[in-house]
Amino acid sequence: LHSFPTRRSSDLIQGVVQKQYPDSYLGEDEMADVRKHMIFHGRVQGVGFRYTAKYLARSMNLTGWVKNEYDGTVVMEVQGREAMIFELMKGLNRNQFIQIDWIDTEEKETETESSFEVKY
């Protein structure tokens, strides 16, 4: 289980992406699909988080789902290339209404699916 805080300025996510995926990184692992189970904490409900995630994920050919929880968090499972998942995180962090304070992340087994959906 990995947890990392984020800042509104997106500096932290930018730093994580740059450390894990420097410009010279072009290994085979970049092309392998991974699946991540993520729990987002912060101002993540009532701000278009799920629909932004769906739009971005579909535009990046990622699969999975996103769902609001009763405790005010948003849970998402997303599958695809790890670099694209981090691009999704950067896109979510750029939204002016979404305030991600913390993300709990766990890697899961990949699944066979063909789209990204909002669960209710």
For the regions a language model picked out, list residue spans one by one.
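Short, small-residue-biased leader/transition segments that mark boundaries at the very start
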Residues: 2-9
